[in-house]
């Protein structure tokens, strides 16, 4: 009745990503006022009172365009054909797993070339049990990459040399997924709706976005990991 078009996405894939784009224009100034939002948490009032999640709201036209393009793909409205030269957002089953593999490989190369100071991985997630990702992280730790995983629930990994695994137990449910690569102010920070599980990476519609460096989330999160709450 109100012109809402309800889409059910790609058949056979559960939609688990959380994102929206508002397209608007100021008629007086004739300028775009588009806004994009992407998050690790659900659009649910109940979740907001007891979950810890990460949200990003931006008017950056690059982010707005890529998030809109991704949403149209997830809605099965178009094929993801106009892949940008420098993507800042990835969708499961169309590039997210490959991007994570590349980031882990880059950390291994940095450990070999520059030492552990520039080869660090920090992961915060609900679950980690994807066999391929687990093996790659074990291999990275064996190559000298310093890895710290904060996992709330299912974890099929065990601590070992260069690999620390902890959980946070507190008043709120830790629900965000963050992947941080690098150290000393040169971190690359990614947030995602996906846990590191086969079903999320290959059988669901999930999103992962690179956080702008100016957001400062990487540095703040490193301090958070060094706290005494573990």
Tell what function each PLM region has.
Residues 1-48, 57, 62-64, 93-230:
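PLD/PLD-like phosphodiesterase catalytic module centered on the HKD motif
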Residues 78-89:
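Gly-rich Lys/Arg/Thr-decorated short loops/hinges at beta-loop-alpha junctions or inter-strand turns
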Residues 49, 69-80:
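Prokaryote-biased recognition of long, low-complexity C-terminal linker/tail segments
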């Amino acid at each position: 009745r109100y012109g809402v078009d309800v889409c059910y996405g790609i058949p056979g894939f559960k939609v688990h990503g959380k994102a929206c784009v508002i397209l608007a224009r100021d008629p007086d100034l004739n300028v775009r006022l588009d806004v994009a939002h992407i998050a690790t948490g659900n659009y649910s009032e109940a979740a907001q009172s007891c979950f810890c999640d990460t949200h990003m709201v931006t008017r950056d036209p690059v982010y707005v365009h890529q998030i809109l393009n991704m949403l149209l793909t997830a809605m099965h409205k178009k094929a993801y054909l106009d892949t940008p030269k420098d993507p800042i957002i990835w969708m499961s089953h169309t590039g997210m797993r490959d991007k994570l593999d590349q980031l882990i490989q880059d950390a291994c190369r940095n450990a070999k070339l520059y030492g552990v100071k520039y080869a660090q991985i920090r992961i915060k997630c609900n679950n980690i049990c994807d066999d391929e990702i687990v093996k790659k992280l074990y291999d990275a730790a064996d190559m000298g990459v310093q890895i710290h995983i904060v996992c709330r629930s299912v974890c099929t990994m065990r601590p070992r040399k260069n690999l620390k695994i902890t959980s946070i137990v507190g008043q709120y449910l830790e629900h965000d997924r963050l992947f941080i690569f690098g150290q000393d102010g040169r971190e690359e920070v990614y947030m995602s709706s996906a846990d590191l599980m086969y079903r999320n990476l290959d059988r669901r519609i999930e999103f992962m976005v690179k956080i702008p460096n100016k957001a400062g989330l990487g540095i703040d999160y490193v301090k958070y990991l060094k706290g005494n709450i573990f």
